[in-house]
Amino acid sequence: MLEEHYYSRKTCGSGGGLSVQRTGYPQTDPPVFKAVNSFERAPLIVGDHVHSLPYWSRKITLECTPYPFTLRWEGGVHKDGIPDKVPHPSCDPGSELVSYTHSREVDCERFIGPVPSSFTDPKVTSAQWKFLEDMADMKALADLNKSLVNLPMLYKERRETLKMVGNRLGGLVRVAHAAQDRDLKRYFKARRKDRRKVAEEVANGHLELIFGWLPLIGELEGAIEYAELPDLDFIRCHGLHTLVLQSTPWDNSVDVRSYPNWERAAGTRITGSVRTRGVVESRASVRTALRFNLETSLAGDARRLGFEPISTTYDMIPLSFVVGWFSNFDKYVRTLAPLIGVTFETGSRNRRTTCELVGSTRFYPRTVSPPSGWFARWKDFPDGSLSEVSGLRRTDIRSVLSTLPDPDVRFHADVGLFEISAGISLLAQRYLKPLQRLLKRKSFFYGRT
């Protein structure tokens, strides 16, 4: 693999605006923060989502975005201790000391430390790839069912768009003819010496009318472009499933005895520490994309009104959605409907492994040590400088599907915040019964004495 090793740095201004990335930074010193940025692909890189070709690609990036701050300390020396050839600032003639203020800009990029060992390509077993492929295939097949149900709505929307364009154009024509007839009669009714003034008013009125039409003209232009689209002759569907493999914390601390070039400030030495914290997360995912040709304008009479009997019956079962929290059976039900009016053309399956690094670095100053005979003290003691670190290792391998994948039921736990909230609300409705227990009101029946 061809990899270029260099510093990848982003410098941001004080306003937080445009960021500039510099590459090819000279490596005069041994690199502490070693950034890798490479991208390569296989010879076959063509993929137009219609005739998918197999390809693989790899991308590695590691960047640091520093937000520097300024250290300020105050130092001084007795007048007698200053050599004659050393210039010093002007001071009060009656003072015994010469004081000055030094400031240095701090950048944490140099002390970020080595890249964590966990920032590598994740290892995925064959069983995990098989699980991801089955889940992605099932989602793609279920997405096909949804597309077929929504197909009549697309045709209806196109017909309504054409009707809207005709009505708007007819209204514009009627308004233009009415304005033309009204202004023409007004011009001939005016006296000859006033016709020039009337013509100017008519011209200004027409300009106002035209400028008032500009938003409407733009709307009609977009509607006409939509109506001119080619006829729908295919349907695309896709499914994606992701699996988090590992999440490793990253904690690195480096002691700084003296920042580079700070010794120039009259031999003053600054000590501190740099600490980097972050998380390295590894993920694996599979994306299945399928393309079907449409043989009829409407794929099946049952879907003419946006209705599919098998999926609708399953959705009418109480709490049927809970099954989708622990398996893909809800997607499997939607694949049982027969494929009427469509034929499978091509498809692809993309395997992706991702290792993402996110962290931040702070510099904490400790002491400022002046040379012998001098004194120094902090003037502004900052709380630390922040630098953001981000890294990404991503590998893609795509293969072609010549046959339609078969649905396979898999069990998995896919419970997030949304599912937990829904479960709590279901328990509250079942056991708390707020309308009866909170209000404690008995049911009222007519005829009761």
UniProtKB/Swiss-Prot annotation:
Annotated positions for site Essential for infectivity: S360
For this UniProt entry, what is the primary localization, expressed as one broad class?
virion
Q: Which domain of life is it from?
A: Viruses
GO CC, sorted alphabetically, is: virion component
**Alphabetical GO biological process terms:** virion attachment to host cell pilus
InterPro entries cross-referenced by the UniProt entry: A_protein
Q: Which family does it belong to?
A: Belongs to the Leviviricetes maturation protein family.
> Assembly state and interactors?
Interacts with the host pilus.
What is this protein identified as? Maturation protein A
**What is the organism of origin for this protein?**
Pseudomonas phage PP7 (Bacteriophage PP7)
What is this organism's lineage? Viruses, Riboviria, Orthornavirae, Lenarviricota, Leviviricetes
